[in-house]
A protein has these predicted regions:
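Nucleotide-sugar donor-binding catalytic core of glycosyltransferases
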Residues: 1-215, 219, 237-240
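An acidic, carboxylate-rich microenvironment
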Residues: 162, 225-228
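Alpha-helix N-cap recognition
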Residues: 219-225
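Conserved donor-nucleotide binding/catalytic region of nucleotide-linked donor-dependent transferases
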Residues: 228-243
Length: 243
């Protein structure tokens, strides 16, 4: 296996524990796996070199293409491509499979066991216009928890370990879209914590089904509708946990 970027504190452990271990169990030899994360649109020289010289059955794990701008012609040189961020333009490619964003390092390890929830719903994240609309819709729904930071990866954001405690104590976790794509780390972190992600449709579609398949999420038409659906579970949290 080779890597072209430091997977650091973000989805590094998710990749190693789930994705790469599955490849190792299924294929036996990871010498043909390349994990790539970068900002440039064109494939890096290392990807091109890897695709040219490594033998057949090469696997590319492509991260970081949040704005769906990376050139993907190189995909045809790999037997299998796993990538973050669903792109409908790649649906026809039989060698391309979607990966969720995974979780940050503090959410690594076994999933939380089911327990009584301290919060019916929670949200921890940065302040944005669409999130203000979301929180306004949930303002009248009691037993919620909200923590707003000044920005993504900012000095005042919660420590991941503290965020995990909040999610583990929440029946539902509100999961608005990220900066440029519907998917965020928050979705898998909620699942890893034993909570139910609450999402809304994008352009009238449940975009998460293209990555997660038949998932257990709350999928609403808008945030007002989402609040109504969550409110319906207020007096039956065990049913919500069983979703």
């Amino acid at each position: 296996m080779e890597e072209t970027a430091d997977d650091g504190k973000f989805e590094g452990r998710f990749l190693k524990e789930i994705v790469l271990s599955a490849l190792e169990n299924g294929r036996g030899n990871l010498s043909g796996v390349l994990v790539y994360s970068g900002l440039q649109r064109e494939p890096s020289a290392k990807i091109v070199e890897f695709a040219r010289h490594v033998a057949d059955n090469k696997v590319l794990v492509h991260l970081s293409d949040e704005k769906l701008r990376h050139r993907r012609g190189i995909y045809s040189r790999f037997s299998v491509v796993f990538r973050n961020y669903f792109d409908p333009r790649l649906s026809f490619r039989r060698n391309v499979f979607q990966l969720p964003l995974g979780w940050t390092y503090s959410f690594s390890g076994s999933r939380a066991s089911l327990r009584p929830s301290q919060h019916l719903w929670s949200f921890c994240g940065a302040d944005k216009a669409d999130r203000r609309i979301m929180l306004h819709s949930f303002a009248s729904l009691d037993l919620g928890f909200v923590y707003i930071a000044s920005g993504w990866d900012s000095h005042d954001q919660l420590e991941p370990a503290e965020m995990r405690k909040i999610y583990e104590g929440s029946t539902f976790v509100l999961c608005p879209q990220g900066n440029a794509h519907v998917d965020t780390f928050r979705v898998m972190e909620a699942l890893q914590s034993g909570s139910v992600p609450v999402t809304v449709k994008f352009l009238g579609r449940d975009f998460f089904r293209y990555t997660f398949g038949n998932h257990p999420f709350i999928v609403a038409n808008d945030w007002g509708h989402a609040a109504e659906l969550v409110a319906a579970f207020r007096d039956k949290p065990n049913e919500a946990r069983a979703l």
